[in-house]
Amino acid sequence: MERRDLFRGALAAGLFGVPQLPAQTASAADIVIERAVSGTPHKGKVLALITPHLDDGPFFAGGTVAKLLQEGYTGYFIRTSNDEKDSYDLTLGETVLGNERDAGAFLQASGLKQMFDLGYRNHRMDDLARTEIRARLIFLFRLLRVDTIFSYDPWGHYEENPDHYVTAQAVEAACWMSGGHLDMPEHFAAGLKPHSVAEKYYFARGPQLVNRVVDIGPAFETKLACLRTCRTMVTHMIKDLNASLVERKLRVPALSGVNSAAIDEFTKVALETSDRAVGRKYGLEYAEAFHHIGPEQPMNDYISRHTVPL
């Protein structure tokens, strides 16, 4: 299923009452509800949002990223593909340029500090050696001292887009290899040091082992603003939807003109539908769901009880 079909399903659910979003499967383990906290308890920590496509992060994790930035994180965006395929009626070159401009607007709206473009060809990432992508990510994790990542679930079920699962598997491997002194030791001559990524928030388009649900109510407007910067991609979704409605001899007046008003309406309905559906299960207005992997708690408890000053 293409991402635009996911949006189309969300919009159809909102407009026509037809639920079409893929359900996520909760794990048997306890699900942690993560809520906003006051102050900046995460000051000094670094997160990286790593996705192949510009709109992946805003849709699946935009609220949680905004929440953590508000709580003190410094954030970076790593885009692995060049997004050359995601437009409705533009040429390849126009598509790359449009999405590149939109990426700059997203960076500004999100509060992320910097973007790193790896520039691999969209829909062709399964041609690549994953060790190459992994090596580049190891370098960035060490350079930026990344503590927390957001990316696609490397074990997400029924994922048809190779860019998604190739990126996800490279991210997962790089997270722990970046802490090894024998992995890419030439980095150390340049002043870098081993650094493992301690925490992962994985999202998926299909069924997933969910163990962390984040209350994004306070950050929902920021998430909405971030998705609205993805104008080239959202325009693609709207035009696709309009074309399918024409085949049924239907139209939605608010979406008929592909302009800022249509983009605002489309993103509002799509995100309200999807994020409310997640939140409703847990008594929240809006929520995002993840498979979360963090530091081993028993060892953390042991350290907190037994550490002494040097």
Residue ranges and their predicted role:
Residues 3, 7-9, 26-144, 299:
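Active-site rim/loop-helix segments in enzyme catalytic domains that contact anionic ligands
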Residues 10-15:
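Sec-dependent signal peptide hydrophobic core
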Residues 17-22:
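C-terminal segment of classical bacterial N-terminal signal peptides
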Residues 28-34, 39-43, 180-193, 205-310:
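C-terminal accessory domains and tails appended to enzymatic cores
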Residues 49, 79, 117-119, 151, ...:
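Structural signal for conserved beta-strand scaffold positions within catalytic alpha/beta enzyme cores
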Residues 53, 161-164, 230:
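Histidine-centered active-site/metal-ligand motif
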Residues 76, 115-201:
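Internal alpha/beta domain cores that form substrate/cofactor-binding pockets in large enzymes
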Residues 101, 105, 168-169, 173, ...:
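Residues on a specific face of well-ordered alpha-helices
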